[in-house]
Swiss-Prot record:
It is an enzyme of class 2 (transferase). Its cofactor is pyridoxal 5'-phosphate. This is Cysteine desulfurase IscS. GO terms for cellular component: L-cysteine desulfurase complex. Homodimer. Forms a heterotetramer with IscU, interacts with other sulfur acceptors. The modification N6-(pyridoxal phosphate)lysine is found at residue 206. Master enzyme that delivers sulfur to a number of partners involved in Fe-S cluster assembly, tRNA modification or cofactor biosynthesis. Catalyzes the removal of elemental sulfur atoms from cysteine to produce alanine. Functions as a sulfur delivery protein for Fe-S cluster synthesis onto IscU, an Fe-S scaffold assembly protein, as well as other S acceptor proteins. Belongs to the class-V pyridoxal-phosphate-dependent aminotransferase family. NifS/IscS subfamily. InterPro entries: Aminotrans_V_dom, Aminotrans_V_PyrdxlP_BS, Cys_deSase_IscS, Cysteine_dSase, PyrdxlP-dep_Trfase, PyrdxlP-dep_Trfase_major, PyrdxlP-dep_Trfase_small. The keyword Metal-binding applies.
Length: 403
């Protein structure tokens, strides 16, 4: 067993060796290194063929059409293209947008930018389990609602939203519906037709592919139009200019192909490991699972260990690569905005750790993690005056601290 143990699959995944091997075939002089837009020689033809195959593999996993796949640099760009592109193109319908407070920053900050441009954004509050209900959406949908953007699976707490329910409402209201599926694709079934989704964002590096490549599903039936955010050679049917990186695209296609084949078996194994981890720690005092345990992807468990500072906990668990907050925002010491949105107080939000398990996690690693967590939580609590006060029955919330 190699230390540290990687339990941060929600922030990124290692590239599957099969994917890396595929990627290498499109880089070197001996491989197919051509520009897919070069139509006058075999180097270009072969590269274009590889891109076409990858498009099919990606579409296959989400029950879409290959012509509905637009390649981008990742889910952040896909989210920007979807939200700004649709809001600008359909501005005549209205300037009202709906999203949720627990979305990824790539969605929230894009919506904030549109607010600066004069759009009105409604932010839905999730329930305590992290779920947003179709009823909540129904109550705020308006005739001038141009776009709804709601994630499929939350990156911090792993809860699964009712995308089909939202899709029905948006379709009936003639509102464009965008879904950030970077945390769900390859982990749970996605059928874009059944879900009535217009736009859907994906990233390769959350599904054992390389970083720097993603895609946006853009529905053809009903046809959705977007205003381009990147201008140049008119690649990707004018929606996203820039030379296509064949090696990254082929690798993303391979990652999606493997996911389609192995998703069911991966889920069973990963869920067993998560259950093992949770059973190993949940008999400890003041341990809280954040977000719904029922409506949740197999690989995510987010736990608050009360009376322990999250930052000191991460330091103490130095042999475990885990995250406190999401990777994109954990550089700041603010408590997680996702946990605050579901009603966790600052203390519990600060003491939260996200464990995310993946394809290469072993039982031995989980057992080691349980051992190290139990040992260190006890040690850190022994050093905490708050823990002593709690054990003495003092209500900490009733104390007024002098500044």
């Amino acid at each position: 067993m190699k230390l540290p143990i990687y339990l941060d699959y929600s922030s990124t995944t290692p590239v599957d060796p099969r994917v890396a091997e595929k990627m290498m075939q499109y880089l070197t002089p001996g491989g197919e290194f051509g520009n897919p837009a070069s139509r006058s020689h075999r180097f270009g033809w072969h590269a274009e063929e590889a891109v076409d195959v990858a498009r099919e593999q990606i579409a296959d996993l989400i029950s879409g059409d290959p012509r509905e796949i637009v390649f981008t640099s990742g889910a952040t760009e896909s989210n920007n293209l979807a939200i700004k592109g649709a809001a600008h193109f359909y501005v005549k319908k209205g300037k009202h947008i709906i999203t949720a407070k627990t979305e990824h920053k790539a969605v929230l900050d894009t919506c904030r930018q549109l607010e600066r441009e004069g759009y009105e954004v409604t932010y839905l509050d999730p329930k305590e389990d992290g779920i947003v209900t179709p009823q909540q959406l129904k109550e705020v949908l308006r005739p001038d609602t141009v776009l709804v953007s709601l994630m499929h699976v939350n990156n911090e707490i792993g809860v699964i939203q009712d995308i089909a329910g939202f899709g029905e409402l948006c379709r009936a209201n003639k509102t464009i519906f965008h879904v950030d599926a970077s945390q769900s694709v390859g982990k749970i079934e996605i059928d874009t037709q059944a879900l009535k989704v217009d736009l859907m964002s994906f990233s390769a590096h959350k599904i054992y592919g390389p970083k720097g490549i993603g895609a946006l599903y853009v529905s053809r039936k009903p046809r959705v139009r977007l205003e381009a955010q990147m201008h140049g050679g008119g690649h990707e049917r004018g929606m996203r200019s820039g030379t296509l990186p064949t090696h990254q695209i082929a690798a993303m296609g391979e990652a999606f192909r493997i996911a389609k084949e192995e998703m069911a078996s991966d889920e069973v194994r990963i869920l067993a490991l998560r259950t093992r981890l949770l059973n190993g720690v949940n008999d400890m005092e003041e341990v809280y699972v954040n977000g719904s345990l029922e409506n949740r992807i197999a690989g995510n468990i987010n736990i608050s260990f009360n009376y322990v500072e999250g930052e000191s906990l991460v330091m103490a668990l130095k042999d475990l690569a885990v995250s406190s907050g999401s990777a994109c925002t954990s550089a700041s010491l603010e408590p997680s905005y996702v946990l605050r949105a579901i009603g966790r107080d600052d203390e519990l939000a600060h003491s939260s750790i996200r464990f995310s398990i993946g394809r290469f996690t072993t039982e031995e690693e989980i057992d080691y993690a349980i051992n190290i967590i139990r040992k260190n939580i006890g040690r850190l609590r022994d050093m905490s005056p708050l823990w002593d006060m709690y054990k003495e029955g003092i209500d900490i919330k009733s104390i007024e601290w002098s500044h």
